Amino acid sequence: MQGSVTEFLKPHLVDIEQISSTHAKVILEPLERGFGHTLGNALRRILLSSMPGCAVTEVEIEGVLHEYSSKEGVQEDILEVLLNLKGLAVKVQNKDDVFLTLNKSGIGPVVAGDITHDGDVEIVNPEHVICHLTDENASISMRIRVQRGRGYVPASARAHSQDEERPIGRLLVDACYSPVDRIAYNVEAARVEQRTDLDKLVIELETNGTLDPEEAIRRAATILAEQLDAFVDLRDVRQPEVKEEKPEFDPILLRPVDDLELTVRSANCLKAETIHYIGDLVQRTEVELLKTPNLGKKSLTEIKDVLASRGLSLGMRLDNWPPASIAED
């Protein structure tokens, strides 16, 4: 049914082709022209860079001090062993950081299934080869650290963020946390009734087995939707800065002149001139005060000294005096 020319077509899931447990193809149509690439590229970038997962981050191998070495009885050099450990597909429940152990002796391959772990850990690819022992008396023992993270974090980036006193023999591994091994999308032509200018989005995805391909796409779409939520209700969500209101006058100016503890003679002279607050007093000049009956130079000097001890002086100019609180009194 033809809708309004301004109404966008809403895509629906057409088909999910499960090629294998780790490989699937998802087809979505119809999409308005151009939206195939818009959505496909956004989902592709999220699937490659932002999917959480678990990866080997550190390894300690008995008898090995650094990665640029070899171990007697082991066919591969240590760099190749570390590279093989990067291919370990691990699922960890309820934990973000676990340690696994591997002890193997005797001639033959050392595989992921030889790793010892607890019930919270699942090795998805137990047949994955880590190295080969070439002698009946050869053995290898290692402690493997697996952490949860997102995207790809090279060992060099983590080395700078960790303590410089990292023990000799603790080897850092480039961590590829993403469970997505490969993602590709293709945009094909689609048709709805008489419209032939529509898009069909085909996403082909492979994972390492720790996450179902369909679930991976679902999570990527959720991440994208959550990031776009801020644009749906577009407004400045920053908290406004609360400016501290400064009092219009120094609180000391609002205090009565009695708080100055002047002599009785000086205090009575000020009251006779209706000078009740310190703010009233500081606005008077020396000449004005000397005109006050019974207030001589001795009292004037006393008043000046008391005001100076409080950082005040005579002849001050106070705009908007008296404040409303005093005027009401």
UniProtKB/Swiss-Prot annotation:
State which Enzyme Commission number(s) the record gives: 2.7.7.6
Offer one example of a GO biological process linked to this entry. Answer: DNA-templated transcription
- Taking the record's annotation, the residue ranges forming a coiled coil are none
Q: Where is the signal peptide?
A: none
The yes or no answer to whether the keyword Transcription is present is yes
Which keywords belong to this entry? DNA-directed RNA polymerase, Nucleotidyltransferase, Transcription, Transferase
What interactions and quaternary structure are annotated? Homodimer. The RNAP catalytic core consists of 2 alpha, 1 beta, 1 beta' and 1 omega subunit. When a sigma factor is associated with the core the holoenzyme is formed, which can initiate transcription.
Q: Which family does it belong to?
A: Belongs to the RNA polymerase alpha chain family.
Q: What is this protein called?
A: DNA-directed RNA polymerase subunit alpha
Organism, per UniProt? Actinobacillus succinogenes (strain ATCC 55618 / DSM 22257 / CCUG 43843 / 130Z)
